[in-house]
Every structure is written in C-alpha cells, then in structure tokens.
Amino acid sequence: MEKYFDRLEKEPLIAERWKKIEELESYGIKPFGKKYDKQIMIGDILKHKPEENLKFKTAGRIMSLRGKGKVYFAHIEDQSGKIQIYIKKDELGEEQFDHIVKMLNVGDIIGLEGELFITHTEELTLRVKSIALLTKNVRSLPEKYHGLTDVEIRYRKRYVDLIMNPEVRETFIKRTKIIKAIRKYLDDRGFLEVETPIMHPILGGAAAKPFITHHNTLNIDLFLRIAPELYLKKLIVGGFERVYDLNRNFRNEGISTRHNPEFTMVELYQAHADFNDMMDLCEGIISSVCQEINGTTDIEYDGVQLSLKNFNRVHMVDMIKEVTGVDFWKEMTFEEAKKLAKEHHVEVADHMNSVGHIINEFFEQKCEEKVIQPTFVYGHPVEISPLAKRNEDNPNFTDRFELFINKREYANAFTELNDPADQRGRFEAQVEEAMRGNEEATPEIDESFVEALEYGLPPTGGMGIGIDRLVMLLTGAPSIRDVILFPQMKPRD
C-alpha cells in the first residue's frame, strides 16, 4: 500500500480524493461500504408516478452534481437508466448532509431512499429521505462532452466508456440478446449445443494462421482452435444429428475494423442436409434475429439501406463473368488463367498453382466489394475448399457458399465432404500447399478425422456465422472493436 500512496504526489486530484476519504473515515463512514439492499432498478422507478406515493430504495453512480448551501441536485445512473435526485438538508438531516452529501463527487456510488415528485422544469425526481455512501470515486471521470473522445482510450478503458456512454452499454446488451436469440432459434429446431476443445493437437477446420501454445506435462505443442469443425463432424459420425458450438475462435492474423484475433462464431452441423438447407437456415437465423432485435428486417448500415430477407443466390463464376467479362466456365490451363489474371491486374501468390486458386482471387479482388444486398455466393473451387463436397455436375467446384452483405463475409457453409479417400487427398494437397509457402494451409494430415469418416458421416450440411460481424450489422457499429468488450490492442509505447 505504501507504493500506491507514494505516487499521489504526481496525481494531485487523486490525492485530494484520498483526503476526503480520510475525513469520511473520521466521521465513521466507510468509503468502500458493504452490501446495500437495492430493491429496485432506476429504469423501473421511471415507470411510476408521484401520485402513487411510493417510497423507493435504489442505488447508482452520480453522473452530475450541483448545489450549495442546503440543497443539492444530482443525477444517478445504473444499468437500466438515469434519474434526478433532490437532496435538502432539512429533509435529510444534518449529520447525513454534512458528513456524506457535502463530501460527494461525480463518480461516487450511493444508495438512497426517496419519493417521486415533479420539479418546476417537469423532470421526474427522487426526493431523498436517506443516503448511504457505497463506493468513493478516487479517480475523476472524464468530462461528459469533452473527455472520453479518443477511441483508443475508449477501447483500452472500456469500463470508463461504459460509465460515460449509455449507448455503448446498449450495444453490448443487444449483443447478448442477439446471441440469446440465435441459441433459441437453433434450440427450437432441435439443435443441441455442445462444447468442443479450444486446444487442438492438430491444426484444422479452416484456412488461417494459428496461435501455438505448449502443454508442459505432455510436452506437446497445441493450437488454439481456428474452428471447431472437425470435432463437430465427429459428433455427427457418433450419432448426433443437429449440433452447434457457439464459442471463441483464434486466428493469428491482422487486426482491423473487421478482424480481431479472438472472435466469436456459431458453427453448426445438420445430418441429412446439404448446403441449400444451410442457405435457408442462415437466412432464417439472420432475418428472425434482426426482426426480434430491431423490429424490422430493413436496416441501414454505413449509410446503405439493406433488406435482410429474400437473400440473393449467385454462382461465383457467374458473378466473375458479370463483373469482369472473364468466363471461367470454359476449360483452360493454369497458364491461361494466370495470363487472364495479369490482364485484369489480379495478384496471384506464389503458392497458388491451379485455375481454382485464380478463380477465387478474381472473386476476392474484383467482386467482393460490389456485393451490397445479402447474397449467397456459391460454387467455390475445390482447391480452396478442402472440407466441402464436390458438385455432382461439375467436380471442379464444391457445394459451398459464403454470405456477403455490404462487401463483407458473414457466413461460410457447405455440404460436408464425407468420402474418406477424397478427404485424405484434399489434406495431402493442403500439406503440399503449406510447403509452397501458404501459411493458412493445413500443414499436417488429421488422420483421426479421416478415420472418423471411415466409420461413416451421413450426408451433412455445415455452417459457421461470425457473431461479431453480425452484431456490428444489427447495431450499426462501424468497427469490430465496438462490439467486443475488451478488444485486442497494440501495446502502448
């Protein structure tokens, strides 16, 4: 504790608060008090009227404070709302007024009992009959309109952001409601929520760079999961027919307004279904959740009007042809495709060695930014879809889709590959691609998954939906950091 107080010379405002704390203690008042019997939330008090003649016992943080002499006004706030309070010495009593009220600061947490009345400015107000100091604020809150404007500080000190900005609290309340609504939608349709490992012995389930950790006792490296896919499909092999896992994934990649290395996804699998069923399920989830949260499926995001129902469906090759004029339905060699890429200024990485890779680059570099209304883009090339089933009519492509809304991907799904020989061949191709320098390719064959497929995976549809991006969409948040309570930040200098 001595080290704590040694720093007060450099922080005079905090030192001043501690002097108040010493004075409070001299009056026998504990500055960091015990449990208070809060009987009602402020938001519920606001539903009542003065003529009901009710007495309320509540608690909250002081957000504004003004007064002198024998009368003080303040606003206190809790999670549910804010209300004005009126404190008069003659009504409260001299001891509580002099020893508590005069020692208050903005940011203090107080408990109080009082009755409602309407001020001459027609504001519903609590007339305080008794008061208790619950927690003395030591560090001053920022000024309401000039203080917490630096977004970096808002993200680093989310607790202050939540105190100062009720709209931020509302975003995270909505996030919880969105997740709850997704769970209910799936539960109501017979899906079982399950838990799968966060630490994986073999990398797999998605194309991404992993975080690596080490288990000392077993003396093995483990990967923080990039996706729960392979474990969930093993559960389908085991006899569960509808499962989902709503949890964290980790990808050791860049940080941006759309990417956080730790993020939340719901991943689900349904036996005796295919990617068409997943399209219907995906649209149903997003439309119903949007309706429940916002009261409509028509929303505005980033200045764009969006309708979250009746999603479009288009094959990747058809969209590329529409946007660029290049027709990848025609048979061509890798060299011919590479020449087309050069002509259209599409970059091709060194590890890419197939027409399928180039088709995907055409889409990502030329088409993604043009998709505004909700659109299922389907028919991804086999080379970039190692876990998806080949299309029966054209085995160069898969029964896979990604959902794009306003230039961003929100979901990824496919008819699951259940042929163990084909799956092993795809894994082998991934290993070769990793050796050519693709850090996102799977560098090792998951033999346990191939073995699981040998027991028999029924025809299955699977899908993953990014929760953070969906929350951004449904709350209008411009950055993923606005919907993650404690986002990853760069170290301070």
From Swiss-Prot:
NCBIfam families: lysS_bact, PRK00484.1. GO terms for cellular component: cytoplasm; cytosol. Mg(2+) 1 binds at residues 402, 409. It catalyses: tRNA(Lys) + L-lysine + ATP = L-lysyl-tRNA(Lys) + AMP + diphosphate. Keywords: Aminoacyl-tRNA synthetase, ATP-binding, Cytoplasm, Ligase, Magnesium, Metal-binding, Nucleotide-binding, Protein biosynthesis. It comes from the Bacteria. Mg(2+) 2 binds at residue 409. Its cofactor is Mg(2+). It holds the Pfam family tRNA-synt_2. It comes from Fusobacterium nucleatum subsp. nucleatum (strain ATCC 25586 / DSM 15643 / BCRC 10681 / CIP 101130 / JCM 8532 / KCTC 2640 / LMG 13131 / VPI 4355). Its EC number is 6.1.1.6. The gene is lysS. InterPro entries: Aa-tRNA-synt_II, aa-tRNA-synth_II, aa-tRNA-synth_II/BPL/LPL, Lys-tRNA-ligase_II, Lys-tRNA-ligase_II_N, Lys-tRNA-synth_II_C, NA-bd_OB-fold, NA-bd_OB_tRNA. Belongs to the class-II aminoacyl-tRNA synthetase family. This is Lysine--tRNA ligase.
